Amino acid sequence: MKAAYIMACMVLLLVGAASSERGKGWCGEIPPLPGDEKFQRIYVEDATLFHENGREVALWGVNFQTAMSWEWGRSRRDKFKPKFDVDHWKSIVERSFTEIQQMGCDVIRIHLCPGDFADVDGNLIETDWLDMLDYTMSECHRRGIYVYLALLNHLGGEKGRDAILNSTLKEHKWAAMVVPQKLEATDNYIRQLVNRKNPYDQGRVYKSYPGWIIAEVMNEPMWPNEAPSKAEFPESVSVYEEWLAANEKQIGSHAWRTFKTEKIKDYINRIDRLLYEEQVPAVTCWNLFWSQGPVHQGWESFDAAAASTVPMISFSTYPGQSDSQKGTSQDLSEQNYLPYLKQSYEDPEYQGWLQEDRFKGKKASIVYEYETWHNQSTYMYPAMAKYFRAQGAQVATMWTYYLNEEGHELPRSHAHHLNLISTPRKAASFLVAREIFKNTPRYIPYATTEDDADQFGHAALSYPLDLSTYADKNHLVYTGDLKSDFVQLPRIPKQISGYGSSPFIQYKGKGMYFLEAVFEEGQFSNHWNVKVMPHAVFDEEGQVVVNREKEFSMTLRIPGMARSEWQVYRVNSGKRSRVQIQPPAITFHVAPGNYEIIKR
């Protein structure tokens, strides 16, 4: 009996020691399969995320809610919603995958809602939403896109189904962290999830996907700031009362804050230990809310996370959110939010806490969500990318890419609205921000050259002009009509991603376009590929109107390209058709689609 007790103690000590080392490069064994070569697993060392090859991680992406009933409902604003058709939804998702890859997304964040595919005991249920998760994991592996899973959220949920969390239990998130039955159900849910065999990938187990790199325990784990009534939360408050008795404490604010900190820390460590025991290579992460999180949620979750075993924390930034919530939803595009980022960086009650010693240098950090709230301006995404790097972030996912289809576009003033087709200027700013995020060193103190504009590195942005751009020797990205004095331009860019006109391209349409030089064995092959996106504008009522057929004039003014030496072809289903070129320079008419420009 004594020997068994000693052995049990040794096992606990080893698990604890291994868990503490997990943030220094631990990863489980992953049986290699075709397609794995697209990925580099990540680990944390010295509060920094690294790929297996030793390079620092810098991943830019979107929230991509393919497996959540809430997102499908959001995309169907009609009074009478059609019955969910999983095959039709997959076709929308597949097209949206192609769009976000065109926008340079490296990673997607997916909310998992037990209310969509698990019962009250945490057992997985075969639903369309679980099928969509299987499909999404498989598609990400096929396409080389990293996956960031938020394991628990309250959104979604079939009507009448009880679950650990569902759409009616937003304020019950804290109960899931303290009630014994919910804790056991959560353990069961996570164990079944990470060991699930994906039928789309020949039964591959979830935890063996090399592209699944982040396991965030819970999205926005809210707690009451004061002890709630037992009538409202009978099971949870009973746990609190038992804790008070065991610790000989009296009911009061100090006791509640102590209980809250202790239980959050216990919960974080519990899930982190469970993921370690299951040998899940994804890095565990704890969510620390939006800007002003300490004001709205108290410091307890921050204190608990700092003292916990997880090697990484996440945060979100929503310029304009508090302004919008003061009244009815409105278009905030005319307001300058650059000062907001400065305040967020400097004020501990906003997000200055990220600069505290207990986080900086102790925990890796990522951005779980960001957005320009009710705002279609194009200078803020790039400014936010610079801000995120100043805060040390290595992964950032915008909330949320809109999975839309023709006839279901969101209005201009919608709180969260990014889509390559229906918000082309904002999509261009997303691409500018991507380049800034990937090419800006971390922890450079955040500052701007002016209160309403900024110029740094290869980038420039302006609130008065509602313009941003990134230009290095190979790549040029811009969000509107660009003049040569706004930023130093390359002589001949090899890639152009733009909206509007620039010294290299004049275009009258209102959609994005992509121009890329084709190289063979390192040499320019006298061949350019051009992709033109649909024309999209907001009408007088602020509704997006997309035209997928309209033609516009495009003129190329790339140095060294004489009109007589080049020919333009439209490419459709692999077949080329010649397009007439007109003066001046290389001028031709384009409709949405693909083109090739080839030297004669």
Predicted regions and their residues:
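Positively charged n-region of N-terminal signal peptides that target proteins for export
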Residues: 1-5
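Bacterial Sec-dependent signal peptides at the C-terminal "C-region" and cleavage site
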Residues: 8, 12-32
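Substrate-binding cleft of secreted/luminal carbohydrate-active enzymes
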Residues: 60, 373-450
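Charge-patterned, long linear interaction tracts outside catalytic cores
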Residues: 218, 222-229, 235-236, 457-505
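C-terminal beta-sandwich/jelly-roll accessory domains of carbohydrate-active enzymes
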Residues: 476-600
